[in-house]
C-alpha cells in the first residue's frame, strides 16, 4: 500500500524484549448526497497498532502484534499503546475492525525460517466450531544465504488468505489504504508462491524472480453473507491466475555509470479480472494473455565531494 502518515515509538526492555507502537491516518472518504457535495461529510479512517518482539534465544524470536482500524480521527482507548485492542473494540460496539497476528522466526546459522498467522474478525466463542468467523491468512517461508559459497540469497515463500479477510461489515473500515491492501500485498481470497534469488557474479548483480498467484472474488455481497454464516466455496465465482518470471541484471560500465537489463515473461489467465466489482457473467469476456517484456536502463551515481 502507499505510504500514509504515522507517528509512533519503539522501546527496548532489556536484551530480549522490544515493544513498538504507531498511530496513523489512512485514506479519508468524502461522502456527498445526490444533490450536492456541499452537504457531504468526511469519514475518517485511522489505524493504531502495537507489536511485542521477544527473543527466547539468539536463534528463536516470536512477534505478537495487534492492530485496529476505526472511523474516528482519534480514539483515546487506542491512543494508549499498552491497552489490548480486541476487548476494547468489542466493548465500544462501533464495529471497529481489529486484527491479531503472531510470527515465529528461527535462525539456523545464517539461514532463516518463519511462519506468520494473521487473524481477522476473531470470534473466541466460535473458534473451534465448523462454522466460525475466524478469518485467517498465513505465510510460511525460508531464506538461505550463501548457498553456493558466494554472495547470494534465496527466498521462498507461500501465502494463503481466506476470502473474507481485510473486509468489514462497515465497508469504510476495510484493511486497505487508497485501494491497496495493507500487509500481504496479494490481498484476500488468494494464494501465492514466490521464489526470489539474488547473487553477485564479478561486477554483475543478478536478480531472478518467480511468482505464481491465484486470486478470487471478494464482493460486498460475499462479505455480508459471511457475517450471516453463509459461506462461499473458494474460487467458485471465478478467479485470475498469473505466473511471472523475471530476470534483472545490473553492472557498472565505468566509474559511477551502470546499466540494467530486465527480461520478463507473464502468463495471465482471465486477464483484467476485477475481484470486487465484476458480475459473474463477465468472466466469459476475459481473455488469457502471454507477454514477454524487455527493458534497458542507464544509471549514473553523482557524488559531490564538497558536501562531505
Regions found by a protein language model. Give the residues of each.
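Surface-exposed coil loops of outer-membrane beta-barrel proteins
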Residues: 1-54, 63, 67-95, 99, ...
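Exposed, low-structure sequence patches enriched in small/polar residues
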Residues: 56, 60-68, 72-308
